[in-house]
């Protein structure tokens, strides 16, 4: 039975199942595992050990799932969704489990894409796009792209564990959000499974085509058509409200991604419903394949670690540093530096910092040559480091950015070779694992992240 037949309306959000009072006893029945096992080619695990493994993710939350399915294909996902829709059983797509707000745990049938749906399907170097399954880690995806001189730009700290599907679901960005967009800006096309098990593809279409298609949708048309109709109606009727209520932030991922669709219509006269899935955390549809656009790998990078006596000094320096057009600016506070000092892997590096260092800013620049990278660092230090005396012999460039703000940095460590830059970045990206590994009763438990 279609959603419109249940409710008598063309609005998918009015599905009567949204009022279903879910209780675990309603779905924990002997035949559930056997039914799913007969429907899919992948793994179906409902044993206590597996359920306990999937009851946690990188967050502080814990919730025992109903069971776990590792799908082998889009057909498997379709079978699970059709069955669970008919039996009113919640379904939760799971990627790498790296999110810190509990997105990957719930009392549901968990679909684990990382185990079996993790392939690169096609690379188009000329078009700078790649098509891949949702379970591939970002690190492995970029390793596959490196020979082409291309990369998938969103780079969360746990890129060796974060997967493409989760990146889209979370609308991830990363340390290089100064240069690159969030995941939504790279979605070209997605193959998805809808709530009723329908498989469809969302990609670019002319905005007028969307509205014309929506106008022809009737109350008994399939769910896919109802979605187009609902998106069209919301974009038309709520245009002014979307503009007014959505914050003008480069890293806003709260709420459904209606502002991105509105922005695309304004800028290019086109709309991509697939971009609405970015940040939806699997609540709108389940991605089974994604075609995403790519960025060129920079020819060279230069990194400098600016040290400060106080965290507030580092914070005051951020705005002037941004005037120099860095590719990344990342902070390391006294807690992280103190713990890193007691970590064998980073103790030597932290030991080279000036005595009394309370915090540091890792600043990175992209460049075409090593010399250009050195010049950009010299320009920054001439502006932000009092009494800077360049060991490289480089003076600040004529016309280089200078600010009226007082400089606060105490010292600087420069890095132009891959090995030293990697050490700086590894210490920054190891921040959360270092915090979680501290001994004693005092522990860091992340549960609210990236607020402003």
What positions do the PLM features span?
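Noncatalytic alpha-helical scaffold of FAD-dependent oxidoreductases
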Residues: 1-452
């Amino acid at each position: 039975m279609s959603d419109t037949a249940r409710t008598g309306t063309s609005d998918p959000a009015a599905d009567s199942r949204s009022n279903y009072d879910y209780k675990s006893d309603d779905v924990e029945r002997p035949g559930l595992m056997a039914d799913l096992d007969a429907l899919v080619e992948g793994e179906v695990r409902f044993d206590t050990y597996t359920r306990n493994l999937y009851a946690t993710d990188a967050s502080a939350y814990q919730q025992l799932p109903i069971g776990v399915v590792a799908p082998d294909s889009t057909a498997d996902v379709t079978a699970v969704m059709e069955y669970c829709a008919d039996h009113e059983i919640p379904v939760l797509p799971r990627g790498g489990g790296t999110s810190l707000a509990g997105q990957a745990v719930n009392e549901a049938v968990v679909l684990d894409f990382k185990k079996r749906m993790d392939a690169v399907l096609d690379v188009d170097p000329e078009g700078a796009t790649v098509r891949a399954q949702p379970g591939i880690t970002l690190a492995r995806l970029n390793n596959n792209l490196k020979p082409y001189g291309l990369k998938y730009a969103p780079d969360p700290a746990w890129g060796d564990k974060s997967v493409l599907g989760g990146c889209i679901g979370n609308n991830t960005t990363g340390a290089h959000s100064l240069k690159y967009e969030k995941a939504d800006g790279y979605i070209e096309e997605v193959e998805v499974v809808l709530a009723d098990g329908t498989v469809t593809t969302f990609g670019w279409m002319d905005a007028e085509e969307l509205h014309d298609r929506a106008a022809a949708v009737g109350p008994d048309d399939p769910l896919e058509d109802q979605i187009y109709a609902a998106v069209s109606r919301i974009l038309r009727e709520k245009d002014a409200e979307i503009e007014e209520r959505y914050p003008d932030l480069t890293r806003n991922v709260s709420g459904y991604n209606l502002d991105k669709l509105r922005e695309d219509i304004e800028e290019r006269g086109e709309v991509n419903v697939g971009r609405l899935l970015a940040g939806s955390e699997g609540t709108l549809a389940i991605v089974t394949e994604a075609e995403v656009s790519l960025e060129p790998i920079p020819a060279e990078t230069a990194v400098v670690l600016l040290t400060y006596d106080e965290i507030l000094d580092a914070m005051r320096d951020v705005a002037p540093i941004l005037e120099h057009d860095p590719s990344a600016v990342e902070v390391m506070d006294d807690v992280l530096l103190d713990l890193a000092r007691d970590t064998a892997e980073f103790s030597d590096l932290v030991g080279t910092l000036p005595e009394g260092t309370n915090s540091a800013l890792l600043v990175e620049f992209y460049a075409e040559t090593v010399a250009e990278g050195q010049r950009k660092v010299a320009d920054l230090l001439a502006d932000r480091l009092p009494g800077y005396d360049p060991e490289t012999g480089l003076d600040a460039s004529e016309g280089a950015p200078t600010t009226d703000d007082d400089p606060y940095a105490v010292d600087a460590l420069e890095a132009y070779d891959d090995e030293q830059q990697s050490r700086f970045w590894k210490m920054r990206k190891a921040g959360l694992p270092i915090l979680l590994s501290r001994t004693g009763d005092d522990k860091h438990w992340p549960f609210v992240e990236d607020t402003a």
